[in-house]
């Protein structure tokens, strides 16, 4: 599973289409629960991810997953 950390669904969907991912291969990280539902998933952080309305909860879940060794690859596409 590919999880996309962006500020909204539209941006996540555009990113997924650009990578050639089809529905079912990816999910937008809209809250911290998504990280718990898909342990060890690959995470793609895209532009404006910091504007996600649930950023504090998501970042805490990312930190917890990293400490528990339940975090897949985190790729940051938000920087040029």
For every predicted segment, state its role:
Residues 1-80:
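Short, flexible loop motifs at catalytic/binding sites
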């Amino acid at each position: 599973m590919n999880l996309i950390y962006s500020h909204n669904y539209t941006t996540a969907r555009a990113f997924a289409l650009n990578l050639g991912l089809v529905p079912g291969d990816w999910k937008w990280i809209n809250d911290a629960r998504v990280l718990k539902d898909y342990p060890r998933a690959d995470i793609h952080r895209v532009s404006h991810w910091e504007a996600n309305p649930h950023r504090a909860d998501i970042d805490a879940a990312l930190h917890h997953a990293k400490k528990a060794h339940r975090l897949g690859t985190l790729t940051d596409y938000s920087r040029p």
